[in-house]
Curated annotation (Swiss-Prot):
TM ranges: none
Source organism (scientific name): Caldivirga maquilingensis (strain ATCC 700844 / DSM 13496 / JCM 10307 / IC-167)
InterPro entries (UniProt xref): Acnase/IPM_dHydase_lsu_aba_1/3, Acoase/IPM_deHydtase_lsu_aba, Aconitase_4Fe-4S_BS, Aconitase_4Fe-4S_dom, HAcnase/IPMdehydase_lsu_prok, Homoacnase/IPMdehydase_lsu, IPM_dehydratase_rel_enz
Name under which the protein is recorded: 3-isopropylmalate dehydratase large subunit
Pathway in which this enzyme or protein is active: Amino-acid biosynthesis; L-leucine biosynthesis; L-leucine from 3-methyl-2-oxobutanoate: step 2/4
HAMAP family recorded: LeuC_type2 (MF_01027)
Binding site for [4Fe-4S] cluster: 297, 355, 358
Enzyme Commission number, as recorded: 4.2.1.33
Gene3D superfamilies: Aconitase, domain 3
Organism classification: Archaea, Thermoproteota, Thermoprotei, Thermoproteales, Thermoproteaceae
Amino acid sequence: MGLTLTEKILSKAAGRQVSPGDVTEITVDLAAFHDLTGHHVVEVMENIGAVKVWDLDRFVIAFDHLAPPPNDRAAEIQVKLRKFAKSINVRNFHDVGDGILHQLLLEKYALPGQVVMAADSHTTTVGAVGAFAQGMGASDMAAILMTGKTWLMIPEPFLIRLINEPAPGVYGKDVALHILSVFKAEGLNGKSVELQVEKPKAFPMDYRATVSNMGVEFGADAAIFIPDEETVSYLSRSRGINVKPITPDPDAKYVDEYTIELNKLEPLVAAPHSVDNVKPVSEVEGIEVDYVFIGSCTNGRLSDLEAAARILKNGKVKARCIVIPASRDLFTKALDAGYVETLTKAGCVVTYGTCGPCLGGHFGVIGPGETAVSTGSRNFKGRMGSPEGKVYLANAATAAATALEGRLTDPRKYL
């Protein structure tokens, strides 16, 4: 019987063939943490009395959740982590402004077939390039950094096929929300979701990263796009790397399969207060909105910024709008393309390299009674500020059209 991509990656990492349900030790290819979780990881290592990293070439730190530090406690945490990084000579260190950890892993480090573990639930993002990527808690992360290994229960492989091409106004976010509408939050617990794209060029890396990012929202242990010509092209264009990635065997067996006809999707939103409270934007059009956030590790990429700029060139925003590209590199590209100028002239506040309001940290949290539209990943009560506020999740085009009109708006009339 053939093997799935998950089984191939984890069998290699375990040094033996593994099957779903096996509990086994695996070797980790890439490990990472950010400022908010990193100080907990370092505390665990200090308590154990072993502040060391098994392979500094395979370890990444990024300051993003508390960047730039909004208070003295955040600054204190970053001071501690800078000292830690210097003490062990961390090579892959990204200070304030470089970008959000998951975007940096995607841009600079993760590769197809790797096992990637990081101290954040949205580590699943880098499954976009064909890696098995999973979030870990502080204790497990400390053990990984010290040994380069971790234990894992091998998840069941689940296949999602993406066929045809997305219609105008439909992006990766809508695919993620569609999956949530079908399987609900945590509906794919214990599964490694493998996604197969029928027409690779019609579903680019930015879209894939959004779906993989939100894999954790539908419960997946990992959300891995099966590498194809788009994967190879992306790595060649972005990093000058030529890869021959592994793929599933033709006779691989999955616990179940599901097919999404991309051409039949429409722009979707997740209404308050759950990621699986999914509705077509056409059903909620007209609801007044106070604030729009475009950014995060979910939707702060170049195609998101392009979509927002294309819509917002039509006028001035009627709802306050904050735009945060996910990395310095993306900000620079958006600047060169004229998107930053367009967004600024439309009345948006544009910054970069921070998680900011997505976790209710800073750079634009919502107040009591306010309604927001966000391109982020979560809309639980209190996630982006006041628990008395409401958050709708949407793609960047929907968010931009909403900012332009000051009310929830179907973006297709602007595209």
